[in-house]
């Protein structure tokens, strides 16, 4: 039985199951599944990733899905305000479509057309060198379908050359680092983005760095912290930021949390233009971190799975040049265990 036939069979047996999970049960990547669907309900796309992203601006509203193994982040918005120079790119629309792109990870693109209970659904799906989905861009009822069709005509190709998938590079991480030096450099930061440089300089994972410094910089909290802080944010009505990412893409929500619904092990946020599904039992560690900036410290809640994957990161909404929200700091403070000086 070929992959496409098996896909149809499993999809019928598991209505509502994510393509990623069905591909996993077939022991193939999601990109390999898309490859198998070509000539049926998928088409290969060719061209520079930046050109395809730039062309997406013309279609207007889309629904974008960025996910990892444990969290799914869905945001409605348009591909305006693009900055796609070099290996890093930005789609910069706070409170709408807000993306951070690591373009050297982007490898293949497919157009997929599916029949659902709600009618036909069209998407453009981007995959990395390992065959995992980085970003899925869906047409909505408000998408300019004439512009969408023009984009497809420009980039779809008849060639479906074999995928050249690579294994994930095993991270080489430091087993010994000078805790006092790491802490000193952490306290000397003036911008949250300097944290990535600190990790790289010492060859550390985020969690390793957290374990090296004092509790006022990084403090482990209960794995139920996410549910607690979402409930607080919903009740208080302050704007928060929710980051979910993978190897090549991070999608950011900024706004008020309107509806939080736990369901079948998933913690969900349902807003009109934003949805989050996060597998709550996958949270193996939760950390509150404080990073110094020129505007005072910035506090985040960071969630990790047992395999070290960063599931999600949450911040209080903050505009550059302004101090962090007092309400967010209060909500974060309620997560800190009693007796911990943080």
Stretches with model-predicted labels:
Residues 96-107, 223-226, 272-288:
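DNA replication sliding-clamp ring fold and its partner-interaction surfaces
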Residues 1-31, 240-250, 255-257, 261-342:
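C-terminal functional regions that serve as terminal interaction/effector modules
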Residues 1-115, 119, 340-342:
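An N-terminus-focused feature that recognizes amino-terminal "leader" regions
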Residues 72-73, 131-136, 250, 308-312:
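Short loop/beta submotifs within extracellular cysteine-rich repeat domains
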Residues 1, 8-13, 91, 98-196, ...:
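Hydrophobic, ordered structural segments
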């Amino acid at each position: 039985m070929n992959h496409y036939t098996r896909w149809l069979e499993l999809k019928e047996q598991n209505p509502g199951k994510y393509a990623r999970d069905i591909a996993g049960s077939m022991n193939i990547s999601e990109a390999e599944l898309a490859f198998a669907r070509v000539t049926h309900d998928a088409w290969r796309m060719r061209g520079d990733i930046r050109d395809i992203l730039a062309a997406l601006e013309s279609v207007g509203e889309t629904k974008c899905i960025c996910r990892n193994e444990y969290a799914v982040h869905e945001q409605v918005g348009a591909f305006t305000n693009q900055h796609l120079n070099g290996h890093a790119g930005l789609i910069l629309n706070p409170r709408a479509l807000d993306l951070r792109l690591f373009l050297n990870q982007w490898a293949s693109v497919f157009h997929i057309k599916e029949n659902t209970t709600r009618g036909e659904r069209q998407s453009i799906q981007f995959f990395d060198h390992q065959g995992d989905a980085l970003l899925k861009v869906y047409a909505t009822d408000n998408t300019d379908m004439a512009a969408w069709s023009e984009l497809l005509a420009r980039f779809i190709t008849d060639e479906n050359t074999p995928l050249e998938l690579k294994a994930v590079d095993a991270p080489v991480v430091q087993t010994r680092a000078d805790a006092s030096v790491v802490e000193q450099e952490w306290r000397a930061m003036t911008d949250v983005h300097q944290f990535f440089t600190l990790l790289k300089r010492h060859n550390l994972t985020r969690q390793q760095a957290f374990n090296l410094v004092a509790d006022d910089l990084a403090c482990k909290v209960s794995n139920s912290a996410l549910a607690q802080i979402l409930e607080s944010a919903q009740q208080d009505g302050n704007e928060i930021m929710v980051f979910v990412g993978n190897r090549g893409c991070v999608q950011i929500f900024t706004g008020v949390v309107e509806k939080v619904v736990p369901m079948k092990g998933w913690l969900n946020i349902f807003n009109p233009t934003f949805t989050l599904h996060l597998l709550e039992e996958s949270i193996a560690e939760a950390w509150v971190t404080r990073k110094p900036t020129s505007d005072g410290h910035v506090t985040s809640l960071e969630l990790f799975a047992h395999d070290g994957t960063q599931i999600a990161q949450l911040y209080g909404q903050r505009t550059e040049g302004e101090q962090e929200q007092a309400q967010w700091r209060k909500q974060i403070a309620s997560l800190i265990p009693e007796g911990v000086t943080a």
